[in-house]
């Protein structure tokens, strides 16, 4: 288990930052028929999110236009999604991804699982606020209308953002482990509710104790037990929560590997994780990826993506010396 070590992103504040100069250069890059995509990559992937917000403000003042809007007009395909995605503040980016996961034909349940299983209380609160401001909709109401069953109940619990923080009680851990064991045996609606209540509301520290107690009681790993007892999106969501509790960077490494190798490069997932984790733990995710899968994330992106889209992803991902 790697829950205690230091995590780190790949994008940091640029030294000697000048938002007016950056805005001018972006304005020049976006002029004309064939825009300078390399310039966009070199500037926007080498500035932290707060600096990008300042660039967008300077751009608006300078040209009277919205930088995201201009990029959406000038760029295309997945490259456009990366460049535009970099220009959202993190809570709004999560809100944007959730909105698009639920609107239109079908629901992208995997996006809902990935975001809501992995975000902190503070991130969830800010995401709900951003969702309401941007779309004039209530995130909880949209989740309720677009999902169903115990999957919906668990998402609704997570989106409250009321997980306990930093609290452990070994005696309660033993009791909760017994409840989880019974829930995996009985599988009634009531047991499913108790299962998701524990996984959604107990602190990460407490849940690590619970999972150890569960192993002692049942002789089985928590993830294996869930996979054996449940199915569908409810099962996938429960597993995602357990994996995030144990080692969040390893969870994202797993998501990236699956997106790259199991689904013929699932672009939305790769873009979302690289952008969302770039200033949080992407460097640590890279380490987990290489430890677990033998190849670097940089190597796999380079092999599966192409063109300026590939350049942008690799600039966000960055790499170790041997990757270049």
UniProtKB/Swiss-Prot annotation:
It comes from the Eukaryota. One of its GO terms (molecular function) is calcium ion binding. Gene3D superfamilies: Annexin. It holds the Pfam family Annexin. GO terms for cellular component: cytoplasm; nucleus; plasma membrane; vesicle membrane. Belongs to the annexin family. This is Annexin A10.
């Amino acid at each position: 288990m790697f829950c205690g070590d230091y995590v780190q992103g790949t994008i940091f504040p640029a030294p000697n930052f000048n938002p007016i100069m950056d805005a001018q250069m972006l304005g020049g890059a976006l002029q004309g028929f064939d825009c300078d995509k390399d310039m966009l990559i070199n500037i926007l992937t080498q500035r932290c999110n707060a600096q990008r917000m300042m660039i967008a403000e300077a751009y608006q003042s300078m040209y009277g236009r919205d930088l995201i809007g201009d990029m959406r007009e000038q760029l295309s395909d997945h490259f456009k999604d990366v460049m535009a995605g970099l220009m959202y503040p993190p809570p709004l980016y999560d809100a944007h991804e959730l909105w698009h996961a639920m609107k239109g034909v079908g629901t992208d349940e995997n996006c809902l699982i990935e975001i809501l299983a992995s975000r902190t209380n503070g991130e969830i609160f800010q995401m709900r606020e951003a969702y309401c401001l941007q779309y004039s909709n209530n995130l909880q109401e949209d989740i309720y209308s677009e999902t169903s069953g115990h999957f919906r109940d668990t998402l609704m619990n997570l989106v409250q953002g009321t997980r306990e923080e930093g609290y452990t009680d070994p005696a309660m851990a033993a009791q909760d482990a017994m409840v989880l064991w019974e829930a995996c045996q009985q599988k009634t609606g009531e047991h499913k509710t108790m299962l998701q209540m524990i996984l959604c509301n107990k602190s990460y520290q407490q849940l690590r104790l619970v999972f150890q107690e569960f192993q002692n009681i049942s002789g089985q790993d928590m993830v294996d037990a869930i996979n054996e007892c449940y199915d569908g999106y409810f099962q996938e969501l429960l597993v995602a929560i357990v994996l995030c509790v144990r080692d969040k960077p390893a969870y994202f490494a797993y998501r990236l590997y699956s997106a790259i190798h199991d689904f013929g490069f699932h672009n939305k997932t790769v873009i979302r994780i690289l952008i969302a984790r770039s200033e949080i733990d992407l460097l640590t995710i890279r380490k987990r990826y290489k430890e677990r899968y033998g190849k670097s994330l940089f190597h796999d992106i380079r092999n599966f993506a192409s063109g300026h889209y590939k350049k942008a992803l690799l600039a966000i991902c960055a790499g170790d010396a041997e990757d270049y």
